[in-house]
């Protein structure tokens, strides 16, 4: 009995059948859904011949059929994937061919929906927003203060105070009239204007020494002109004095002259100028005030130190005035302030640029005595004959007009109140005691003035008066004559009497000082450029730089809103808003730059280079607009080239086979596609910038047209070898290459997003979006247009002459339903028999095709040529590596502006002459404990100052807020110690005590109030006389924030000068003798800054080295608990260079990996992807090296070009590689096949890319020409050489094997027989197998089924033989 064996055999056969069913079901799904089952019966003999040489290129599905039939072996996984892509590309092509017009209209309608975004286009012109890295520490640091303000004001920030603060039951005394104070908006320097308005003066001719009388006078005159520039807005006239940054006047004690002095100082406190003319008395000229103050003789009569007539900084000695007024009235600690600030005689003790200047004061070191000179001149002149005598012009001396308006106001303020007080006082009693406020005891004002006059006026000397009058009348005329005739001065003056012109180099060595000599020190490198020295002294210079500061909008608003002098009567103060102040500032700045651009000294050669915060933004906005003329010219050139390459002539007009109309429409629709892409990008919130408007239109056109030429090239061939579903076949064969290059280009620009520069991210994003839109156009709209053109050609109509017929030489096209499937071939194409003849082009040797076939391909097959190519490539790579090694970092700020514009000229002058940059060290955060970290802060500042890039004035760093606070407190400690020794204070409560009728000094009274204040407590017992506010150079931590409040309010001018920029600002407070209350403690500081000046930052490597050094120090002290960061233009615009190389390496790795993965997925051949990557890497190295050798510096813009080179390089290699991979035959045959297939479209694509790029040469921006035109042109040249020359040579040596190899070893593979024949073969094979199975034993049947490949293959596909007829 054999039943167990039979059961086992049956069970095994059942399992085998189940496996076969599952396998067949799986294969059926793949073939039905993923593979097209294309039928060779549908194609012409010419197409079959093409298939025989490149089967997998033409039809991967038919290649799989041959593998199944055992006619070939190959990578079935790759071919299955290829067949899937080709099936869907074929279906897309068939669909757009059938519904061509509908596809075009619907696609264009959807595209046009994106145009709505163009209504909201924003061109970003803020260079800081364009350049500062997004998401990095720099971005966080720049936004820190704004974020802290927002959090604090919205209540989200809970500040952890490190010292115990107890809530007092009794609120402190109201400070300054219960006013909520806001800190000043200190000007921010970003190197591009900001609050710092800059003027650079350069020589009028080459070799001029600008340290000369004439040049310095020109600079002085310009400063005076700037101070008078005005604009009219809001019914008022505004000048620089209305908007400039000026410190507030110092505080005065309450008294009869306190308010008056405050008003006077508010009018006379000047704008802060940083200028080289501050070395001279002439520096006072632009300070004003304008118009001058005329206090009249009444005021001058009792303040003899005031100059008679008009009062300006040219004749004002503020220290003398304060001292004299201080003997009459109690002015508080103002004298102490003047001494610490070093105001002294202001400008009156400085030399005059020209001692013959009429207004040069007598106190000037080189004052010229015109009266003595006039006497000598008259003696000399009178000795001459009448005909030779010099006639001087007499000056009319005006009579005094009496009291001025301001004098009347002052006198009324002083005396009016007293008169009213006396009139109201009706008592006959004599006051028992005289109060301190009663400084006079005259019956009326005239008696008071007469008393002062009698005590100061001496007896008159008639002879001296006559001499002085003569000098007044003719002195000015004499000085003018002497200036015009310097060669004749020796005729009446001795050598000792000659005018004493200063040695300008000696005077300006070491820099200059403002009106506050101790607090306003302008380093030499800030104000003088192109310096030459001799023994440390300046001997010549080539440039002068002046800076004046403009306040923030809110400060100007507050100043005007609270102005009690009613200086702008036409302004509606009730409706005045901060934005209006901002408009005034920006309008004045634009007027300032406009006036200097057109200055008379800038006509022949630009000497004055201005820059305001609006300058660069305005210039970028103007030149960032689309240049439609250049764009139109560029697109016309592209149309002409496309039409030229696609034109075919027959007789007098274009032939039927010509594609000029397609080329023109393609260029136009690529343009429309790009415009719609920009609209879509705007919908996504991507702003435009100069790179967008100047580069993207041309770059997207050049890259978008490449694949259009590939489609047109294959279209010429397809219509001559196919008569059915031509567009489907076109996309099936060409669509893979189009997708391969387009996707890699898109990925390349997406990878550029790794660079954190906003402008470059916008550029890369917009370009990627435009390329994606172009890809959709190439896959849908353009094939539909080709389908329409195909109908023309089938009808025999000439190109661009549809009423004229030509010789079509082709059969009429037929089409299949759009739902072509794997089952459609035989039934739907039954009856189709007509085949097209094989098509060959006529290509003379001078055409691209003729050169290729007759010269180029034979040359590449020569081993000597191959060796030369490889040696040349190796050499280029070596030079490339050397060039990359020697390349330097850098992008000059002037390069990002149009070359011929004034802002660019300013930046070039600055780069040439001034390597000076300001910076701030910022202390920040709620974890700071400044009172107890004073020593750490000093160490931090000292270590920063030890950098070789830091400027030290006379070996010392720039003073900062804590050092100024410490000096102020030390001066108060000294005053308090002196008055305590004199017994002028009650030690228990701090109240002042008169000793011999004298009260304590104002400084000591403020000091006593501060010593008794600590936190929220006020207690003098045990503190007065026993402790100081500053001990061993350390401020007492217990009362630190109380002292800070006192300094901020009493010494507020010093606060402004310190540029501390406190946040939160201390509360308001003023000294009140009658209210002994605590000085309110300031809140712990969340933000403060200390200024530094840096020099020798001549280029990007030096700046990067400085940043690394400063950053290292900042990070060290942050780790030690002192949260801080640096700030300034150098950090703003060069910070990204610290990570540029890493970001570039990262981006190139990302795009390289992406390209490798895309090629590997689409080709399913890692070795082919590796070879492409090798060529792309070679191209990138060569490009980077040549950029270095050409002097193109490495920066974020050139980094984008290198990143994109990886993706764009695929454009020139992927086509050739794919054609080589799909070709059959020997190495040389495959080389010839791939070049014949791809050389012409790649060449035309390169030319079209170059035509798109070449229009960049007309850009106004240097960086566009340098970093896009030069590099992109070089990239195209390298890409063509490496793609069409180096890659083919490498492929002949180490190229991948063909995807398919005929089993018979031949170099051709004919297409498979028609599907109906294959079905018949399979059916016959199955029936024969079944008959044999019945004759065999079960074991033999099982063995036969497993061992026979052909039988197995036939049986596996037996279920697939359900032909449409069966169904």
UniProtKB/Swiss-Prot annotation:
The chain crosses the membrane at residues 98-118, 626-646, 660-680, 695-715, 738-758, 768-788, 864-884, 1144-1164, 1172-1192, 1200-1220, 1238-1258, 1274-1294. SUPFAM superfamilies: Multidrug efflux transporter AcrB transmembrane domain. Changing residue 706 to A: No obvious phenotype. Residues 1-97, 647-659, 716-737, 789-863, 1165-1171, 1221-1237, 1295-1367 are cytoplasmic. Residues 1302-1367 are annotated as: Disordered. Keywords: Cell junction, Cell membrane, Glycoprotein, Membrane, Transmembrane, Transmembrane helix. One of its GO terms (cellular component) is cytoplasmic vesicle. It is a multi-pass membrane protein. Belongs to the patched family. This is Protein patched homolog 3. It comes from Caenorhabditis elegans.
